[in-house]
């Protein structure tokens, strides 16, 4: 039962897989290894990809490894070279889970020709860059012809429908099955189990002490 609350976050993470072209044997990088990024990385691995998790936080990288992510890379300077070395030149899919526009733009160079960038984290904050250069990475064959995709979960219907393969309900059912079988690992992500009266402290920790607070559960009884 303590694992059930993670279903909601894992369903969000699954959206990135549903819109991707990830297949067995592909290389996938995930930028941002918070709850959603961690689970997106795990799901990509379950789909048969070699996954590279990227984060500035050593603690989050350590948690990703505890959840079965075989390759982790420190974000920042030198990350591009390390990712490309693991991915034999570039990843086929990059899942951007931080929501930081600068990270999305700078990680385009990590992607191989005809690869894809999946925006899982909702972009926020102002960021100025050379848009022409970015658009050329999408448009020009010599620059990669990279495909950008949005992974906002509400692109899918809530209820199951015989004419639509994916839905939020179906994704949740899949997640339940993965949690039950132990294939999706979330136990290492539980950092705190708190009383409801400690909600303010929990939200403060999640906002301001992200290395200490990952998955916070409330004990209601």
What do the PLM-derived regions correspond to, one by one?
Residues 20, 70-149:
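Glycine-rich cofactor phosphate-binding loops and adjacent beta1-alpha1 units
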